[in-house]
Amino acid sequence: MSEPLIELRDVWREFAAGDQVVAVLREVNLSIQAGEMVAIVGASGSGKSTLMNILGCLDRPSRGGYRVDGRETARMDPDELAELRREHFGFIFQRYHLLADLSAQANVEMPAVYAGMASGPRHERAAALLRRLGLSERLDYRPGQLSGGQQQRVSIARALMNGGRIILADEPTGALDTQTGQEVLRILKELNAAGHTIVLVTHDMSVARHARRIIEISDGRIVSDQARPDAPPLDALAGDEGPEAPRPAPQPLRAWLDRGSEALRMALLAMNAHRLRTCLTMLGIIIGIAAVVSVVALGAGSRQMILDDISAMGTNTVDVLPGKHFGDEKAASIRTLVAADVEALARQPYADSVSPEVTTSATLRYRNVSVNGTVQGVGEQYPRVRGVRIAQGQFFDAAAVARRGQDVVIDNNTRKALFGNHTDPIGQVIFIGAVPARVIGVTRPQETLFGNADALHVWIPYTTALSRILGQQHLRSITVRVNDSTPPKAAEAAITKLMLQRHGTQDFFVFNTDTIRQTVERTTATLTLLVSMIAVISLVVVGIGVMNIMLVSVTERTREIGVRMAVGARRSDIMQQFLIEAVLVCLIGGVLGILLSLSIGVLVSQATRGAFQMLYSSGSMVLAFVCSTLIGVAFGFLPARSAARLDPVESLARE
């Protein structure tokens, strides 16, 4: 006699009930040959369902041995048991256990997805099985659109999808009317005639009599095992290929991609089924990611705005001033900064441009209009040194400086104050105190955080200011613009050394504007980091919310998880499905968060009329994607792991 296809040896199944241990199965010995049709019959509580769960590798014996096709199951891990269910067993449940969000064909295809069957053959086989079972017009129907008998036919087709060498039918007629139940039994007998091994679990002896062998179970023990050789045979189901599914050996990569696409599809269906909950969960991610990206963009925009203002005062410049420091009371009495120092500094290789500076206040008059303004005596290179741009006319040249020319360049505020908006100031003569000067240029307005934006400024040659207005020879300061190839610190040291050589004493100090830039960058970086950390904390809170929602989802979909495990899903497949769902929620939220942040940037720009721009970087957006992905993985892992470790028997029993 050939080796049994199924063999149980002295199997016990015990459960803990408080401090006691309850034996549900006792000393069960059973062997079933390939091609048999066996009915296991017993009253409710007799242990027949527990026996079926052990036969289908959904549960394990507490003691004893169980072999399937010669393979001992005792030491198999959960994934090896899943392989047995996938490759050998097909389940037909009393309550059908079809997934409500999938079509009839998709429900039938599910075991083949986990078996790694290619999509083309998978679609063809599922459709062929449904057609043979009389459902050719119902391939795309959802379970809710099918009658009970049609749903059970879909369940039978699903059991046959991977070949269904052993079909376990648990009360297959229990939820059906008599006529439909008889039709299901006829199909099972035809499948048995085609070579499938059928194990029929029922409490109804009239149903059990359709089998060739009836095993009675009571109080966890087999009390009767009778063969019925007189049972009438039936022809095989027309067109059935027999127990083995005709599929090529699966390619690991393709099989993994197919399972991934199935997980993605189920994630999308689950999200769509709970749209409000998904949107509320996603809203937290959207706000968190938008906050992170916006904070970084605000920090970068603020930093750039301040640096632009520093540039307006002079980009990469070093100022030489009398005294020891700002506010030195003796600075006014030091008169050693002179024009010769300017010429010496201008000859240095690190000097891009140099301008002396003296400043005073004076009354500015044009005809009958008088205003108070600041008069600055500077050199011809002043626009280059300070980044001043001319809107109209020109700046005075070296010749005007040499001849102490009475030329003046005015700012836009002075133009408005003296000439209004209708008179062209170029060529007009104004009085600076008692000194007449011809207007040769108007500077562009400068938006700056530093200084008074409403102040009036005019610029004249420093030689003119010294001789005609101030009546002195010494300068208030000298500003050197350092060329781009020289580090500011090196230029500062070289200027200090040169001035010490010229003056013979430290009667001056230098101020490097690069110090302001470095301070601004450090400050903005610190503030950006601080606010970003607050945003990250909010993302962690959002992540906990995602984990909570996913745990709720696992609880709601426990039965679905049990069905997937019954048809052969590995633990990794279940974990992958829920991880993908969590990551998908977070990724979509991340994308929408970035779009929200970009929209905020547009609104800020419009609200400030372009005066302030949020600066976005690809790095911050990539970081946002990484953050949203990590949130999905980190906070989706625990729910996914919880789902993967569910017991298939308990999951199937959950309503």
Swiss-Prot record:
An example of a Gene Ontology cellular component annotation for this protein is: plasma membrane
InterPro entries in the record = AAA+_ATPase, ABC3_permease_C, ABC_transporter-like_ATP-bd, ABC_transporter-like_CS, MacB-like_ATP-bd, MacB_PCD, Macrolide_Exporter_MacB, P-loop_NTPase
The answer to keyword Transcription applying to this record is no
Q: Where in the cell is it found?
A: Cell inner membrane
> PROSITE patterns this protein is in?
ABC_TRANSPORTER_1, ABC_TRANSPORTER_2, MACB
* Enzyme Commission number(s) of this protein: 7.6.2.-
Q: Does the keyword Amino-acid biosynthesis apply?
A: no
Question: Which residues of this UniProt protein bind ATP?
Answer: 42-49
Q: Which GO terms describe its biological process?
A: response to antibiotic
Chain positions covered by the region annotation Disordered: 225-252
SMART domains named in the record: AAA
Topology within the bilayer:
Multi-pass membrane protein
Pfam family, any one: FtsX
GO MF annotations, alphabetized:
ATP binding; ATP hydrolysis activity; transmembrane transporter activity
- Give the protein family: Belongs to the ABC transporter superfamily. Macrolide exporter (TC 3.A.1.122) family.
- In UniProt terms, what function does this protein have? Non-canonical ABC transporter that contains transmembrane domains (TMD), which form a pore in the inner membrane, and an ATP-binding domain (NBD), which is responsible for energy generation. Confers resistance against macrolides.
- The identity of this protein, by name, is Macrolide export ATP-binding/permease protein MacB
